[in-house]
Amino acid sequence: MTCRNYHNKYIYLFEKYMYLGGEVFMKKIKEANAIAAIDIGSNYLRMSIAEINTDEVIKILEDVIKPINIGKDTFTSKKISIQTMHQTCYHLKNFTQLIRDYRVKSYKAISTSGIREAENKQYILEQIRLRTGLNVECINATQERFFMIKAINYNSNLNSLKQVLVVNITSGAVEVSIYEKGRLKFIEQSKIGSLRLRETLGELESKTLDFPAIMEQFIENKLYSIKSTIENLNFECLVGLGGELKTIWKIIRAKSNSNNQKHFLKDGNFIKREDFMQLYKHIRRMTNDQIRFTYGVSYKVAELLLPSILIFHCFLKITKSKNIQIPMTSLRKGILYDLAEDLLDINKKKESQNYIISSVWYIAEKYRINKKHAAFVEKIALSIFDQTKKLHKLGEKERLYLQVASILHDVGIFVDACNHCIQSYNIICNQNIIGFSDKDLQLTANIARYHSEETPKQSHKDYYILCDQDKMTVSILSAILKLAEALDISHLEKIKELKLTSDKDLLYFNLNSEEDIVLEEWNFMRNSDFFEEVLGVKPMI
């Protein structure tokens, strides 16, 4: 059920109350395991309220969409205006009323590039918190991608396809990623989103008779490096996200007056290449007003339709794809699934982590690390973590930090073999690890930095700026990583099995190896003091 305005919402609730009978209806609301996802985007404020059950089924109860000028403000003046801030808070306050009406158990509110790139970002987020009570997380592009991939994965099976190209057009950027049987093989982003493109080149529109041609030239210039990577690859599927694709699909479907065939994506559809090209030729010659009146769309949609079509047209030319697959999903759906995984411990959570790790191995391969050594250190580090849970009492999130740091601890060798630890820190901090926030990257980079002889110190600025809890997390995980690294100093993977036993203040590492491990034992003892200092037990072989 879609709520077009807030008054309709209360009419609907009253009618439902009368239809079911008061007690029955109130019981249904009370029993509903409701969650909510709020997306504060560049063009729209969106909220989805859903009901989840133990069968991993999410049923949308309410979708609310309100237009906003956040992106227009940010991409033109780099600041969000006071007027836009007031409008945003007004609508979000109404969102919170719906959250109370549905007795939502858990919610997640996020903002994307419109707020993320605004110079007054912190002021806006604080005003939202004070005026509405909503705690909004300003996510980065990789987190945004993680939620979208999660949403797609619940509605399809990308793992079964050999090679998939995913093109995600947001208001601020275009992100291109390649997946091979579910593993990320390539990712790159270009800041030519539909709204940013329109705002960046807007002043040229009155100076040329062929503004679409100017935009196309600009797009091709920005996508040059991406083109060289993907133009010779054969994709089983081109998946399109965002960029008013649903509007484009509806226009084409209405024009053909028949439903397109269903594809492998549940509730998904596709646009045939020839149909898209025909629409491209028509819209390319139209003004925003002509688009609005011809296709019955709002002005906001009309002004984004042309740049979106031009961007997708560029990718169709590059890939020779026969169609564009359109998962009928959204960023909000991905957030809802993420909330559901946390609440119900859904099996797909492990699958989501696999996407993160595949993106990490993509980075590792790019920096030409020793994959066997990295995989061995990862295995040993996670084994130590799992067998010492009673000592450190850390959770799955921290385990993921350790896993990523273990894989990437040597990436700095690519830049400087002599000072590779600090270079590993610098490289990791500047990576796009899918699903990782800026804070996640900072913690992981610190853990990787201290994998060798160096230990965390207050004089290290990047360690000093962490809060006390995060400092402790870094120290514990780097202490574990040090020992894992020490046990493969030869890079020969000599240790076949590792079992830990404890006796008072001693932690025994029982190693099974068929080779001489004198070097490993020596290096282990050199790195054991820091482990004892942090965790209070002395590791012994």
Segment roles from a protein language model:
Residues 31, 41-44, 101-104, 130, ...:
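Short flexible coil/turn linkers enriched for glycine and charged/polar residues
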Residues 152, 165-177:
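A generic, well-ordered mixed alpha/beta core segment in the N-terminal half of proteins
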Residues 56-61, 183-185:
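Beta-strand initiation motifs
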